[in-house]
């Protein structure tokens, strides 16, 4: 075996000089015990000296496998890669939680027109109509209230006695006595009747407001609002599209950053 060593060395030297080099003389066999005598990346045989001063013939695949074993046995310590991956996981969770919240949010119920809603009380209808159609309701209410008060005052002037009626409905005796003994009984009588007729006055005001609103809309003085259901659907679709676009952009950015981090880590491993 020993007399073949010089011949083998000379052959390897010729092959090393004639063939192109891709990895240099000292490449992937740094973890093999013993000094490296000669190594070529394209050659299939590597000649090394063992710990007992014996010449060993190793293939390039074995050399690379011995190099990779210690790298696999000792993974890289947690550093920039794990830190960035942690940030990416947190951002993914935020995006998915925001999308889940947007999808889980129930749609707002369609609010009916207070002028046509019979499911609520008269006073609530009056308040909602005042908020939505205040510019129309206020003039109508003032006109109808004036008509109501004028009617009651005229009735009091004509000698209509409302005291028995007030006693019948159960008003306090203090109020009834004021109406009996007051010199200005006509005004107080008209006011008492005005307050008693409050439900009827509110009903007439709402009816007058409804008729006025229809008239103004038919002649183009008021814009007809779009249906609430269609409006809410359009808004929900727009919000959903915006959230989807933001999720895709965030996902692409995180994928690019993760790929760059992997490339950097693999490059560091190759350098080591």
Swiss-Prot record:
Domain of life where this protein originates: Eukaryota
Assembly mode: Interacts with ATAD3A.
Keyword Phosphoprotein (UniProt): no
Protein encoded by which gene: FAM210A
PANTHER family from the UniProt entry: PROTEIN FAM210A, PROTEIN FAM210B, MITOCHONDRIAL
Name of the protein in its database record: Protein FAM210A
Compartments in which it is found: Membrane; Mitochondrion; Cytoplasm
Pfam families the record matches: FAM210A-B_dom
GO cellular component terms, A-Z: cytoplasm; membrane; mitochondrion
Family: Belongs to the FAM210 family.
Residue stretches making up the DUF1279 domain: 117-229
Region (Disordered): 246-272
InterPro entries, sorted: FAM210A/B-like, FAM210A/B-like_dom
Membrane-crossing segments per the record: 136-156
Protein's job: May play a role in the structure and strength of both muscle and bone.
Coiled-coil blocks: 229-271
Keywords: Coiled coil, Cytoplasm, Membrane, Mitochondrion, Transmembrane, Transmembrane helix
Record membrane topology: Single-pass membrane protein
